[in-house]
Amino acid sequence: MSLERTVVMLNEDDTQGRPLADLVKEAAKSIAPLWPISSFIARHPWMGLEGELFADAADRWQQVYGIDLYPPMTVFYTALKKGEIDPVFVERRLQSWLDKQSLPVPRHEAERLCRSFLWNDTVPEEAFSLPEMAQLAEGTQLRPMAVQPISKRLDQIAKRLDQQMIKWCKLFYDESGGTWTLPQREQGFYQAWRQLVVTDPSLSKDERKRFSGWPHDKHEALNYALEKLGIRDEDVVAYLEAHLLALPGWAGMAVWRSHRAGDEVGGLIDYLAVRLSIEWVLTAPHLPLHGEENGERRDVLPLLAAWFYWTGMTPEDWRRLRTNEQQARLAFADRFWRIDRHHLWLEAWEDTDEAKLKEAVSTRHRMSEPEQVAAQLLFCIDVRSEPFRRHLEAAGPFETYGCAGFFGLPIQTRVLDSEDVHPSCPAIVDPRHEIREVAPPEEVEPYRFRRDMFRFVSKTFKKMKQHVLAGLLLPEMSGPWLGLHTLARSAAPAWAGQVIRYTKKSVEQKPKTTLSLHYHEGDETTGLPIGLTNEEQVEYVKQLLVTIGLTSSFAPLVVVCGHGSETTNNPYASALDCGACGGVAGAFNARVFAALANLPSVRAELAKEGIVIPDETVFVAAEHITTVDELRWLEVPPLSEAAQQSFDRLKQALHDVSRQANAERMMKLPHVGGKPRDPVAEAQRRAVDWSEIRPEWGLAGNTAFFIGRRALTKGVHLDGRVFLHSYDWRDDPTGEALARIIAGPATVGQWINLQYYASTVAPHYYGSGDKTTQTVTGGIGVMQGNGSDLLAGLPWQSVVSSDRELFHFPLRLLVIIEAPSYYIERLLNENSEFRRKVENGWLRLSSIDPNSGAWMKWGDTHSLSVWSREMGIGK
């Protein structure tokens, strides 16, 4: 790509005459919604950029905002030394890339330069030894074509602007229920801020005076600020984008609030109106700015030295080139050094990883299938289920299936006697029904009394802590109790955790509940119908069973396993729960699906459609606790004789399965010191130890999403790195089930993958830093200290095993589909969004032919050809 092309790309967006909301919506593509940390949902930080090639987005992000979307070269070289990258794939990727480029120089010259860049992280000192080098570089400069905020060119003012925004955002977005809240919050962020800012003591008298006559309408204020700052129409989108990326966490919270309120950009207009209004007030005395408008020029001396040193070009050769030829060479070298070499190393790493996975699947030891399956278990696709499923299948005549952990139920849930509801489905799915826990009224009343008594202590403590006068007395009153609590939690965490759980359970004594499965009128507050109609009950059960290929040969016992986690003193607890259930445990959904599948009316209708569930088959609900790899029973209805035998056999096997799965998992955690003597006890200690920063690895290490029959991967040690979604193409002649998997679970898997990827490659920006120095703020998220951006990603401890070693491999998700090639072609032709992800390199796609076993690679991040099958993988 030439320098001239770069200039055109960054200035081609003509915004003149477009409505303000459209401009804000366009700028908002640069950020992603940020959910409150209490229901942590993996977010794809670049979901608005998927219309661009991954490499082009990385180029723009680095040039304009200084954000790297690739791992540093040291990470690639370390992976190479460990055998995680095959150098053959590096060379193969280089040749493929060169074949597709319009090169500004002869092929052999470009190849020498690029290969040198690939294998050297710095230009050697001797390359700068030519005396005329500096003189040649002086007249040739490159600079990033960026539209930067006015305030960013005034360093101290930029810091003050961020401090002001953090202060006001903390006040407005607070959900902690504090005693003192921001007045007039109900009128919106801009209105509440506008009425108070004129008395803000952190602003000088002159700065407060500048707000005199400032618009009270947010739309007028944003337009007025852009005008006063002198932003040209064609630069407005880029200017707003830069402001959103200055504090992407708080801006992401504004996006989430807007979406929750049903207003796509209203909250962002509020946010930007406040930010740009403050910016003008702080920068007004310095306007207009003179000098470089779009940032500092970049020195090209290292690039020039590289050309001379690695290609053999001489100063005389350089002088004979025309100016545009010099620019083209420098732009080529600059882009390859900053972006393309990283991209080729990343692709080579991904190719190596895929080749290893292909070999493992192709050479697997085929486990003998049991003559009669005792139990079938439905697990979430979560990568943490893979080791547990593998050990369970080896322990007896048990089959496992994988599906999204919400079990295809678009519901919001309300636990017994609660005013709160939770959307227990993926963030990309809108709830259509509400399911409630219910119990006899005579049992609910005493339960409410006991529960409220237990909560009263916590609420009183919180209110006293937030009260001006009571807060002074609190340390004296609570000191002895908190001292004992601290001692117990620190010296005997396992014992203390058991005592606290037992006490809570004993005091509350929650009655046995049933579920509101059957339809009746909608709720007054949410408008959603409570329960499901008979047709909906049948459809949801059928849809899941068909999708995972479980339509016949039912075992006497079918276990529906949600999953959750147990940790202590962990702000990121919800990040370890089920993402498909909106960041909470999947127990509720498991109970609902099992109950639906046991309904005689549902089974009768399913039988009419060819899905015959035997009378002896019973569905039961369980929960896989990933922190301790334990299966806990949630609801076990009366069992048939055959189901009871299967149940007893499964229970007997679970102890060893848990021990083996924990042993495998504990060995990956740092500071365990090899294989622990009692892996179950070690896992349980980590779950209740409030000083433990890594109770488990979560979904770190995820790299692939497999869609196909379990028989293809059964017995393969996938190391807890692969999402496993059951699918049988033979039960899906129209491809509808595959399309649902791609649109739902696979998309969520991609979000999770890119959340971990971003937190690994740009931890300072997309991660959340050191877990031990974080502060929970406003009940919505975490900050570093008491005045930072709202941190949107994962803590450093979630992706690294030490300060010098990554645990998570930053690879883009590989989706593998077991289906004939025409299924994949149909999917790509009908699903333009998924096709765009593949074409532009935001995920990778391969397929396995179910008849021949051939492994086929689809798509290419440079050629944009969905049908390319190259790189030698699967041939």
Swiss-Prot record:
Q: Where in the cell is it found?
A: Cell membrane
Q: Which residues are listed for Zn(2+) binding in this entry?
A: 380, 382, 563, 578
Q: Name one GO cellular component term.
A: plasma membrane
Necessary cofactors: Zn(2+)
What Gene Ontology molecular function terms does this protein carry? Answer: zinc ion binding
Q: InterPro entries under this entry?
A: DabA (IPR018752)
Membrane association type: Peripheral membrane protein
Pfam families for this protein: DabA
Q: Tell whether Repeat is among the UniProt keywords.
A: no
**Major localization listed first in the record, in broad terms:** membrane
Similarity comment: Belongs to the inorganic carbon transporter (TC 9.A.2) DabA family.
Name of this chain's protein: Probable inorganic carbon transporter subunit DabA
Which species does this protein come from?
Geobacillus thermodenitrificans (strain NG80-2)
Q: Lineage of this protein's species?
A: Bacteria, Bacillati, Bacillota, Bacilli, Bacillales
